[in-house]
Amino acid sequence: MQVILLQRVAKLGQMGEVVNVKDGYARNFLLPQGKALRANESNIKSFEARKAQLEAQNLETKKEAAAVAEKLDGQSFVVIRSASDSGALYGSVTTRDAAEAATEAGFTVGRGQIVLDRPIKDLGLHTVTVTLHPEVVVKITLNVARSVEEAELQASGKSIQELAAEAEAAADFEIAELFDEIGAASQDD
């Protein structure tokens, strides 16, 4: 099916282009979301008449997205999740979780705007892409941790494995000290 794009669509084309897409993609995605019109003569004529208005509208939304992008780019958001000692999450962090974290910080980001390169299934810092407008894309960081204190430590550059190793070393040291004290006490007797 041939359609006229009303806005830029990733991996498809720019606004105003007539492109050939599969019928299901057009019927189920492009047409219902208002991203395209069927490419027949009447729609082409009406699009040409509205083209200047649509371009102005697109430019306005792009400016708004760029203003939000300026504030949002490079931001870090904390997501608290329960995890095993090795750092593997019980479940995963989804686009909804990322959108909620950004919304709690005062940004209006929908879960459809979040793009995860891969599922987030472990603790740590993860870079996530946010598409605010088809032409405005920013990167944010999700700090996935078990607690706020752990998130602060991760943000300062320490990994979960380093923290676990430090805790284990401290526990071993305390046990060794305890045995030394017990040994010294038994020698005194």
UniProtKB/Swiss-Prot annotation:
Source superkingdom: Bacteria
Database matches in PROSITE patterns: RIBOSOMAL_L9
Keyword flag RNA-binding: yes
GO MF assignments: rRNA binding; structural constituent of ribosome
Gene3D superfamilies cross-referenced by the UniProt entry: Ribosomal protein L9, C-terminal domain (3.10.430.100), Ribosomal protein L9, N-terminal domain (3.40.5.10)
Keyword rRNA-binding: yes
Keyword entries, A-Z: Ribonucleoprotein, Ribosomal protein, RNA-binding, rRNA-binding
Pfam families found in the cross-reference section: Ribosomal_L9_C, Ribosomal_L9_N
Stretches assigned to coiled coil: none
SUPFAM superfamilies noted in UniProt: L9 N-domain-like, Ribosomal protein L9 C-domain
InterPro entries for the chain: Ribosomal_bL9, Ribosomal_bL9/RNase_H1_N, Ribosomal_bL9_bac/chp, Ribosomal_bL9_C, Ribosomal_bL9_C_sf, Ribosomal_bL9_N, Ribosomal_bL9_N_sf
GO cellular component, one term: ribonucleoprotein complex
Biological process terms in GO annotation: translation
Role: Binds to the 23S rRNA.
HAMAP family (UniProt xref): Ribosomal_bL9
Family as reported in the entry's similarity comment: Belongs to the bacterial ribosomal protein bL9 family.
The protein's name: Large ribosomal subunit protein bL9
Natural source organism: Cereibacter sphaeroides (strain KD131 / KCTC 12085)
